């Protein structure tokens, strides 16, 4: 049985919606708040919320270093909105004391779309997701200013990069979990499934 166990970092943000989307994409989904829970999952989703708050809570719960270690070790990880910011190697406009987990060689701008439009929906063509374009919900969303050579741009909107993949790390500016379209989560579940060693099956 090749059903991956995927955690959702449950420190802040729309955790429940991600749990539902992952289950719909044929994964076993569970909340992760502590290092011992992180150790038990095959992959992790970092949900939207407020990136500064997530950073502070990750430190408070003793999660920041275990998260960095697992991501460096190749654990598949998917970040949406604030989660995208957490996976960036660099933030263009960080708040004081704000730290990231890193994992994707990209520079992000926090709340970039929010300056123009607090929240909106838009269709986005995402590389690797078949069929119709994905309906993306952007809520005070970041965008990616630039990516390094190792990072692959999967989608753009309005001339800005909104989805990126580097190895086992995936990030989107938008919230696919809020639309009922679970294809982006399906892409991530496939990434997790492909990463699992035969011994772990």
From Swiss-Prot:
Belongs to the glutaminase PdxT/SNO family. One of its GO terms (biological process) is glutamine catabolic process. CDD domains: GATase1_PB. The active site is at residues 81, 175, 177. InterPro entries: Class_I_gatase-like, PdxT/SNO, PdxT/SNO_CS. It comes from the Bacteria. This is Pyridoxal 5'-phosphate synthase subunit PdxT. Disulfide bonds: none annotated. One of its GO terms (cellular component) is glutaminase complex. Gene3D superfamilies: 3.40.50.880. PANTHER family: PYRIDOXAL 5'-PHOSPHATE SYNTHASE SUBUNIT SNO, PYRIDOXAL 5'-PHOSPHATE SYNTHASE SUBUNIT SNO1-RELATED. PROSITE patterns: PDXT_SNO_1, PDXT_SNO_2. The lineage of its organism: Bacteria, Bacillati, Actinomycetota, Actinomycetes, Kitasatosporales.
